[in-house]
Design a protein with these regions (language model features):
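Acidic/His-rich, metal-assisted hydrolase cores and their charged scaffolds
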Residues: 1-174
């Protein structure tokens, strides 16, 4: 399932995407798709905000002007014109998405019809906490997508070979 597919199918709802803050390429895909569908983007979660800011400063993330808005500006836009990129894809109790699901987030309330995408599979051991968050979101009437939206953040064998040939380390542990 691609972001383009999800955005096209859920054009009348707010979209919230939980992903790893460190997966800058995935964040870029989300921003590109949000721009294509004329949506404003809110970044939520301390690690997400910090990493995106650094990635922009270093030129690793291309964000068109006026795409990102502050969370306080959400109320100025119709829900179907917004996307939230957030932490919490692993069900971490203090992450932004978990706080939204538990109704303790100070600025975002999950509404019936919201589309929530878990953009990564649960790491072994996190299944119970991820399921808890999914159940809380579903109970609030959100449409939760958690299958077929995963991309690996790890290098494949050929990518490792390329890195080793470029860096030429004395020792390497993949």
């Amino acid at each position: 399932i691609t972001f383009d597919h999800v955005f096209a199918e859920h054009k009348d709802t707010r979209i919230i995407i939980a992903t790893f803050a460190s997966n800058v390429d995935r964040v870029q895909q989300i921003i590109n798709t949000a721009c294509k569908y004329d949506r404003k983007v809110v970044v939520e979660g301390r690690s997400m905000v910090n990493i995106i800011q650094v990635a922009q400063e270093l030129g690793y993330l291309n964000v068109p002007d006026k795409t990102l808005i502050e969370i306080d500006q959400l109320k100025n836009y119709p829900p179907e014109k917004t996307v939230l990129i957030t932490t919490g894809s692993q069900g971490e109790s203090m992450a932004a998405l978990s706080r939204m699901a538990a109704d303790v987030h100070k600025k975002v309330t999950i509404m019936p019809g919201d589309t929530i995408i878990f953009s990564s599979n649960p790491i072994p051991g996190n299944e119970k906490s991820v399921s808890k968050v999914i159940n809380e979101l579903t109970a609030k009437g959100a449409n939760v997508i958690f299958q077929d939206a995963h991309v690996s953040g790890h290098a494949c064998q050929e990518e490792l070979k390329l890195i080793y040939s470029l860096v030429k380390p004395k020792y390497a542990i993949p």
